[in-house]
């Protein structure tokens, strides 16, 4: 981290010490009623009764459990034990299967490793950085601090995001380009960029031949070179001026 705080270290104190933080269990029987504080014993009994009534009404499989990717192995084990032993079914999942597993598979298939192919130090050697669909200042302040340092040294930044994130313009840092695309058109914008790279002869052929499947690359290059993928052709879709 080199002296910089991570997300939890930088922001966790805000909600941990917030005056509105709930510190005791509360129950209400309807949305129109105010919350009332109860003991932990009453809270557990109330929750158990509600879960039991759901199964009685809708069947054993009506309840499942899903854990966070930030749970420890022990916590995840306890959740699956609860679902199987107490609720009597196998409806157990984890959000990592939805978010990280597809990412890892895609990275492995494309780049040969299921993790990022660069390290934080690489940003210190970049001349142009592209930030797409991310807000490093809030989501990863350690990396954002190092990126801002490099930008202050003269590197250029391209932000591709519908939002005007902090990096678009902040003290001593300003993006050279902000492509405020319409939500959901990321692929179209990236394909249009690839179209320009391929059709204007900007491909580093030696690099691609060394590191990629050249036959597959040629198939892809022919696809993105189609006039349908030109920046002018997708401008109305993406909202990004050609």
Protein language model regions, located:
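N-terminal export/assembly segments and adjacent metallocofactor-ligating motifs
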Residues: 1-200, 215, 220, 241-242
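Histidine-acidic residue clusters that define the catalytic metal-binding segment
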Residues: 36, 229-237, 241-242
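Internal, active-site/partner-interface "lid" segment
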Residues: 201-234
